[in-house]
């Protein structure tokens, strides 16, 4: 994959439910704590090195931000870092929360 793909929240939810992809949430800590997708990893400048060490780059990665804009830059960055299959979630957490309000966790993990 030379370029990331943009996917809808329904496709992201299906991939996550089937264990087909890792979900990375790039929103700020306060927003993440207020609500995030269960199982999402909070990706920050501080957690990025650990992700790079622990992830083989082969498992697909989905990037989520607030509305689907910032995730595009992060997805492109991850591709340049050697991740093979990267997706940006269209509409971000805002779209996820509207589509799947029952699938929102609170607090940090």
UniProtKB/Swiss-Prot annotation:
Keywords: Cytoplasm, Transferase. It is found in: Cytoplasm. The active site is at residue 65. GO terms for cellular component: cytoplasm. The keyword Transferase applies. Its EC number is 2.8.1.1. It catalyses: thiosulfate + hydrogen cyanide = thiocyanate + sulfite + 2 H(+); thiosulfate + [thioredoxin]-dithiol = [thioredoxin]-disulfide + hydrogen sulfide + sulfite + 2 H(+). InterPro entries: GlpE_sulfurtransferase, Rhodanese-like_dom, Rhodanese-like_dom_sf, Thiosulf_sulfurTrfase, Thiosulphate_STrfase_CS. NCBIfam families: PRK00162.1. HAMAP family: Thiosulf_sulfurtr (MF_01009). Belongs to the GlpE family. Transferase that catalyzes the transfer of sulfur from thiosulfate to thiophilic acceptors such as cyanide or dithiols. May function in a CysM-independent thiosulfate assimilation pathway by catalyzing the conversion of thiosulfate to sulfite, which can then be used for L-cysteine biosynthesis. This is Thiosulfate sulfurtransferase GlpE. It comes from Edwardsiella ictaluri (strain 93-146). The gene is glpE.
């Amino acid at each position: 994959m030379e370029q990331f793909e943009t996917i809808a929240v329904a496709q992201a939810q299906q991939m996550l439910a089937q264990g087909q992809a890792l979900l990375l949430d790039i929103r700020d800590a306060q927003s993440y704590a207020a609500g995030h997708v269960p199982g999402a990893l909070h990706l920050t400048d501080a957690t990025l090195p650990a992700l790079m060490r622990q992830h083989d780059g082969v498992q697909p990665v989905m990037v989520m931000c607030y509305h689907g804009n910032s995730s595009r830059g992060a997805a492109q960055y991850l591709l340049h870092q050697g991740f093979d299959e990267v997706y940006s979630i269209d509409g971000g957490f805002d779209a996820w929360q509207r589509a799947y309000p029952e699938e929102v966790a609170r607090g940090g993990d």
